[in-house]
């Protein structure tokens, strides 16, 4: 589970998640000479604190939290950070491989001057050769593209019927809920439609939202609108994307959109943003895709909208009570598409996120972080 106590005076990096073992940084001579590596598999909060107590003599200068971070033990809370065994004296930073940072007591980290870094690849990192800019946004956008296509064309539902029937004619007729020849465009009282020329509203236009917009515009031929608290003039001018302010005025504009993609972060302000009032203003037959956080959707209101036809398709990569997936969502395979929070789950992102996290540690410990902390430092 863990290494033995330190026998050298080198600063220690605690890994609570497995890094990419082939990482160039991890395996570099400079990294190995500079740091001692300590590994621990999280189990319970009490076991973790006991582990830290046994390693109080180690100079833990950084924690590599990877993707799962401290979710298994209830997050990085004040009670952990201010526990007598927590290495506040030497700990300079905690690094994540994910964009999200739910479950962190940011105020307490700030109080004790412990930096938290998340994954960002929107600017170059000179310590990494061949960094792929916007990789995570690109890969999450692929997920959005699939869910949007599912909404318009229902390919997975047709695939299911094809496997069940073993006959192309029967599969199409079963989808149409009629006997005789079926062209394939009918699904009961719904139709498979082309996304070309349809209007899509993207809620949030950060690095992920922008990549979603590019793929939907240039890949599917959709007309892009975006909604946030302030206009991105560069995108509005260069790409002719139409801006809408994220406030009460958005309700009167929702009727025009065939699809809405949520890429907003989970905050108190965005919780249940997609509620009954929001959906009542939407065009019947809406395709709704959520890549942000599960709690942005009021699940009861969304479920009711699926029943009434206000929503024709719901695509989810994040869920309200994650890791659990609501039974109603799972069982409605004709009206929903679901992926298990894997929008960014590619080999490319896994490897690059590790390199970026390790270079953050190198920069912070060496005192060089100030030049680039504006694009990946949380606190």
UniProtKB/Swiss-Prot annotation:
<feature type="active site" description="Proton donor">
    <location>
        <position position="341"/>
    </location>
</feature>
<feature type="active site">
    <location>
        <position position="293"/>
    </location>
</feature>
<dbReference type="GO" id="GO:0030267">
    <property type="term" value="F:glyoxylate reductase (NADPH) activity"/>
</dbReference>
<feature type="binding site">
    <location>
        <begin position="341"/>
        <end position="344"/>
    </location>
    <ligand>
        <name>NAD(+)</name>
    </ligand>
</feature>
<dbReference type="InterPro" id="IPR006140">
    <property type="entry name" value="D-isomer_DH_NAD-bd"/>
</dbReference>
<dbReference type="GO" id="GO:0004617">
    <property type="term" value="F:phosphoglycerate dehydrogenase activity"/>
</dbReference>
<dbReference type="GO" id="GO:0016616">
    <property type="term" value="F:oxidoreductase activity, acting on the CH-OH group of donors, NAD or NADP as acceptor"/>
</dbReference>
<dbReference type="InterPro" id="IPR029753">
    <property type="entry name" value="D-isomer_DH_CS"/>
</dbReference>
<dbReference type="GO" id="GO:0016618">
    <property type="term" value="F:hydroxypyruvate reductase [NAD(P)H] activity"/>
</dbReference>
<dbReference type="InterPro" id="IPR036291">
    <property type="entry name" value="NAD(P)-bd_dom_sf"/>
</dbReference>
<dbReference type="GO" id="GO:0051287">
    <property type="term" value="F:NAD binding"/>
</dbReference>
<dbReference type="GO" id="GO:0005737">
    <property type="term" value="C:cytoplasm"/>
</dbReference>
<keyword id="KW-0520">NAD</keyword>
<protein>
    <recommendedName>
        <fullName>Putative 2-hydroxyacid dehydrogenase YGL185C</fullName>
        <ecNumber>1.-.-.-</ecNumber>
    </recommendedName>
</protein>
<keyword id="KW-0560">Oxidoreductase</keyword>
<feature type="binding site">
    <location>
        <begin position="291"/>
        <end position="293"/>
    </location>
    <ligand>
        <name>NAD(+)</name>
    </ligand>
</feature>
<feature type="binding site">
    <location>
        <begin position="207"/>
        <end position="208"/>
    </location>
    <ligand>
        <name>NAD(+)</name>
    </ligand>
</feature>
<feature type="active site">
    <location>
        <position position="322"/>
    </location>
</feature>
<dbReference type="GO" id="GO:0005829">
    <property type="term" value="C:cytosol"/>
</dbReference>
<dbReference type="InterPro" id="IPR050223">
    <property type="entry name" value="D-isomer_2-hydroxyacid_DH"/>
</dbReference>
<feature type="binding site">
    <location>
        <position position="317"/>
    </location>
    <ligand>
        <name>NAD(+)</name>
    </ligand>
</feature>
<dbReference type="Pfam" id="PF02826">
    <property type="entry name" value="2-Hacid_dh_C"/>
</dbReference>
<comment type="similarity">
    <text>Belongs to the D-isomer specific 2-hydroxyacid dehydrogenase family.</text>
</comment>
């Amino acid at each position: 589970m863990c290494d033995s106590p330190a026998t050298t005076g080198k600063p220690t990096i605690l890994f609570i998640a497995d890094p990419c073992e082939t990482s160039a940084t991890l395996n570099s001579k400079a990294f190995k000479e500079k740091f001692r590596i300590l590994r621990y598999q999280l189990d319970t909060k009490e076991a973790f604190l006991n582990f830290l107590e046994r390693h109080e003599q180690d100079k833990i200068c950084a924690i590599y939290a990877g993707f799962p971070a401290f979710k298994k033990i209830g997050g990085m809370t004040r009670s952990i950070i201010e526990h007598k065994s927590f290495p506040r004296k030497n700990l300079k930073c905690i690094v994540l491989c994910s964009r999200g940072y739910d479950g962190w007591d940011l105020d307490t980290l700030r109080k004790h001057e412990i930096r938290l870094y998340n994954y960002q690849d929107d600017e170059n990192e000179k310590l990494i050769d061949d960094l792929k800019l916007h990789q995570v946004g690109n890969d999450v956008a692929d997920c959005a593209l699939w869910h949007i296509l599912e909404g318009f064309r229902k390919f997975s539902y047709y695939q299911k019927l094809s496997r069940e029937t073993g006959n192309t004619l029967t599969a199409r007729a079963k989808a149409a809920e009629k006997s005789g020849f079926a062209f394939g465009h009918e699904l009961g009282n719904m139709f498979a439609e082309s996304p070309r020329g349809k209007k899509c509203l993207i809620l949030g236009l950060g690095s992920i939202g922008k990549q979603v917009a590019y793929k939907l515009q240039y890949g599917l031929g959709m007309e892009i609108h975006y909604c946030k608290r302030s206009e991105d003039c560069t995108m509005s001018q260069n790409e002719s994307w139409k801006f809408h302010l994220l406030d009460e005025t958005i309700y009167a504009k929702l009727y025009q959109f065939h699809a809405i993609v949520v890429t907003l972060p989970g905050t108190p302000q965005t919780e249940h943003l997609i509620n009954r009032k929001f959906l009542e203003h939407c065009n019947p037959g809406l395709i709704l895709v959520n890549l942000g956080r599960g709690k942005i959707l009021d699940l009861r209101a969304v479920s009711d909208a699926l029943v009434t036809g206000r929503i024709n398709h719901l695509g989810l990569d994040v869920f309200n009570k994650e890791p659990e997936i609501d039974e109603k969502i799972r069982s409605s395979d004709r009206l929903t598409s679901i992926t298990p929070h894997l929008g960014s789950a590619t080999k490319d992102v896994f490897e690059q996120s590790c390199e970026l996290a390790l270079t953050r540690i190198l920069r912070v410990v060496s005192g060089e972080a100030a030049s680039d902390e504006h694009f990946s430092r949380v606190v």
